[in-house]
Amino acid sequence: MITIHVEDLRLLGRHGVHAHEKENGQEFVYDVELDVGERGIDDRIADAVDYREVTRVVQDVNDARSYDLLEALATAVVDALQERFAPERIRVRVTKPAVEPGTVSVTSSRP
């Protein structure tokens, strides 16, 4: 089983419940795991998952609209990655570092 990890993908987003979060934006950190079966073990690029495309899908979801809740944002990323790559398992963690005090994160997954 091959698992692709995209870690610490930092993107500016306008997500949150409060008006200032939507107006000013803030950093969100994405960690993605995709179990892609045996894709890529034959060393053929055509059979592998393009890592850049994984990050592009995450960025597209992040930029497409504003979400009030991290739960909805994380699930939207899971849905988009599932549709694009059809992995055997997927896990997306979205972290919102600018929460006082500390950091908040939400994980959405689908086997």
Question: Language-model segments: which ranges?
Answer:
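N-terminal, polar/charged subdomain of small-to-medium soluble alpha/beta proteins
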Residues: 1-111
